[in-house]
Every structure is written in structure tokens, then in C-alpha cells.
Amino acid sequence: MPGYVLTYFPVRGRAEPIRLLLADQGISWKEDEVQIPDWFSGKDARKKEAVFGQLPQFQDGDYVLYQSNSILRYLGNKHGLTGANDEERGHIDMVNDGVEDLRQKYGRLIFFEYETGKDKYLKELPSQLDFFERILSKNANGSKFVVGQKISFADYNLLDILQCHLDLCSKSLSAYPLLTAYVERLVARPKISEYLKSDARNKRPITPKHKK
């Protein structure tokens, strides 16, 4: 197995779905932690080398990749987490894009609108969660994954953003039995469960705006 290096800030953020995938698949990786003040002040010289000036960065030997969803897809392709056929692959990409839409809305709330917009956000959240509940219902009556019989890279992304919303409001999934069971099922996977209990996971806040 090649040596993987994940470069990111000391938070969960956009790197967390990648970590969930690696942990669940039993793949070891090294964390290369970048201090947030050094990055945004330009003190950390790696910012000049970063494509789009953003993290996370993922390194697989000599190969370097940026953009969290591209990294997830790369790992999905490499480790058989992209579906069994073209139709499943297309559907997995669609779900992952839907997660990205929700993640961007969540990010705007946390970083820019939390004090004034949280109530409105939670009131409108069902309009987003309805989509994912419906997606689950169409695959084995919601008893499996977003697509097919095997976990995909999109599942790790969806799990993470759902956990973010449970942190935001513990009742955010209460009206969604399939999503609730889905989260419970995935966090019970032995290697995910082990990772979620680890010091490495729990020392990192969700974002810089969150307290540890």
C-alpha cells in the first residue's frame, strides 16, 4: 500500500469524509497539519504551491491532488468504491454533488450567518434532507447505502454532513427514519466506530468556529 499523506488544518472540515473513507477501508495515512494563521497570512509557503490556493491536499507517492471531492473520487476509483456499473457510478456522483450543495449551505451558516440565520436554516433544512431520505428509500428500502449493495465514496461524504447537522441540532434527523438508521448503521461499522472514538478524531473541532 502506498504512503498516503493528507494535508489539512487541525479541524475535521472538508478532510473528514476522506478520513472516514480511509479509516473504514483499513488504509493507513499520515496527517500533515497546517496551522490556520500561518496559511492565511502566507507564512506557510505551501499555499503558493496549492492548486486554487486551498486545502485539503492529498499525496499518493509522487501524485498530488487537491479539492476534497476529487480526492474522494480518486480514492473511490482506486479502492473500488464507485459502483458496480455506469448507472451506479452516475448515481453516486449525483448524490455526492447533492452533498456538496448541502455542505456549501452549511458552511455559509457556520462561517457567516450563525447568529442571525440558524433558526431560518433549521426551518428550511427539511427541504434538503427530504432529497436524501427519498434517495435511500429507493435502494433496498433504505436498508443499505445510497446506491447498490456496497458502500461508496458518496456514503462517507453524506455520513459526515449528516453528523455535522446532528451536532448543529440533535433533532435535525428526527423526522427521517431512514437517514437516522443510515447514520446508526454506518457509525456501527467496526473501523468507523473505532475511528470515531479515537483521540485523532476527537481532538479536532468540526470547523475553526466550533469548540473542541
From Swiss-Prot:
Disulfide bonds: none annotated. Expressed only in embryos. Not expressed in liver, lung, heart, kidney and ovary. It catalyses: RX + glutathione = an S-substituted glutathione + a halide anion + H(+). InterPro entries: Glutathione-S-Trfase_C-like, Glutathione-S-Trfase_C_sf, Glutathione_S-Trfase_N, GST_C, GST_pi, GST_superfamily, Thioredoxin-like_sf. Residues 85-206 form the GST C-terminal domain. Conjugation of reduced glutathione to a wide number of exogenous and endogenous hydrophobic electrophiles. Highly active towards 1-chloro-2,4-dinitrobenzene and organic isothiocyanates, but shows no detectable activity towards 1,2-dichloro-4-nitrobenzene, p-nitrobenzylchloride, trans-4-phenyl-3-buten-2-one (tPBO) and ethacrynic acid. May be associated with cellular proliferation. Homodimer. This is Glutathione S-transferase P 1. It comes from Xenopus laevis (African clawed frog). The lineage of its organism: Eukaryota, Metazoa, Chordata, Craniata, Vertebrata.
